[in-house]
């Protein structure tokens, strides 16, 4: 198996839909019931690069494994449920600390899933026009008002950049990195992953260039062979 060129990791509390998001994108289906034990991953070829996407368990007993899966990650998808504010708070309280093992220039996406269960948006049409934005659809009486607003995710994103001591001017804008999705309908799922792929690829190329510059030509550094001079009798 070819070694991945980059890594993306999904983090978040249990039941926010991390596995469903990944399976919706990779397998084009919505699983009825699924629970990740420990971790699982897919390989996605994007352009000429191989990117691994890691799904992690949100259960407390598997919490410590998160930092292991985040090691060397180029991007982290922090996932919450738009209908449960506590799942957004948990990202900062429980999961942000697990990202210490990620790359120093790691990207962060804040993703509010299960937007199909709210009364504020029509998500039946699949992909829409952009992250953290969308046209207001007709209200459905069986749905509930959204409990977490896009501006809450934007605030968390900016807080993460400060926590990581990353220059906000050098990182993608919050509006580009905060998404609302529905794994059930596919709303914004392709947009989420492919936005990250397009951002991660230049990072991979830059890392390869830096590694190439640091490569030393051992042959050119060999000490010239000395010849022993002899004495004439």
Curated annotation (Swiss-Prot):
Expression across tissues: Present in a variety of tissues, but not in brain.
Enzyme Commission number(s) from the entry: 3.6.5.2
GO cellular component: Golgi apparatus; phagocytic vesicle; phagocytic vesicle membrane
Annotated Pfam families: Ras
Residue window of motif Switch 2: 55-72
GO biological process: cellular response to type II interferon; phagosome acidification; phagosome-lysosome fusion; protein transport
Enzyme class: hydrolase
Region (Disordered) location: 119-138
Record-listed GTP binding positions: 17-19, 32, 36, 58, 113-114, 116, 183-184
Catalytic activity field: GTP + H2O = GDP + phosphate + H(+)
Sequence ranges of Basic and acidic residues compositional bias: 119-130
Keywords recorded for this protein, A-Z: Cytoplasmic vesicle, Golgi apparatus, GTP-binding, Hydrolase, Lipoprotein, Magnesium, Membrane, Metal-binding, Nucleotide-binding, Prenylation, Protein transport, Transport
Reported regulation of activity: Regulated by guanine nucleotide exchange factors (GEFs) which promote the exchange of bound GDP for free GTP. Regulated by GTPase activating proteins (GAPs) which increase the GTP hydrolysis activity. Inhibited by GDP dissociation inhibitors (GDIs).
Family, as annotated: Belongs to the small GTPase superfamily. Rab family.
This protein's domain notes: Switch 1, switch 2 and the interswitch regions are characteristic of Rab GTPases and mediate the interactions with Rab downstream effectors. The switch regions undergo conformational changes upon nucleotide binding which drive interaction with specific sets of effector proteins, with most effectors only binding to GTP-bound Rab.
Protein name in UniProt: Ras-related protein Rab-20
UniProt source species: Mus musculus
């Amino acid at each position: 198996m070819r070694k991945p060129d980059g890594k993306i990791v999904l983090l978040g509390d249990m039941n926010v839909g991390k596995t469903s998001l990944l399976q919706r994108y990779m397998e084009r289906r919505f699983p009825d019931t699924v629970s990740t034990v420990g971790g699982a991953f897919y390989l996605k070829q994007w352009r000429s690069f191989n990117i691994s996407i890691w799904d992690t368990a949100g259960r407390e007993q598997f919490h410590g494994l998160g930092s292991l899966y985040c090691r060397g990650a180029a991007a982290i998808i922090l996932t919450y449920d738009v209908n449960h504010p506590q799942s957004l708070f948990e990202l900062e309280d429980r999961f942000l600390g697990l990202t210490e093992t990620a790359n120093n220039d790691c990207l962060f996406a804040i993703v509010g899933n299960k937007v199909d269960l709210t009364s504020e948006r029509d998500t039946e049409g699949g992909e829409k026009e952009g992250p953290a934005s969308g046209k207001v659809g007709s209200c459905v009486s069986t749905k509930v008002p959204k409990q977490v607003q896009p501006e809450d995710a934007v605030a968390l994103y900016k807080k993460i950049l400060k926590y990581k001591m990353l220059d906000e001017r050098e990182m993608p804008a919050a509006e580009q990195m905060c998404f609302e999705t529905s794994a059930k309908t596919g709303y914004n799922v392709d947009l989420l992953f492919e936005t990250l792929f397009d951002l991660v690829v230049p990072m991979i190329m830059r890392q390869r260039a830096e590694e190439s510059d640091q490569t030393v030509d051992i042959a050119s550094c060999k000490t010239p062979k000395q010849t022993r001079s002899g004495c004439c009798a």
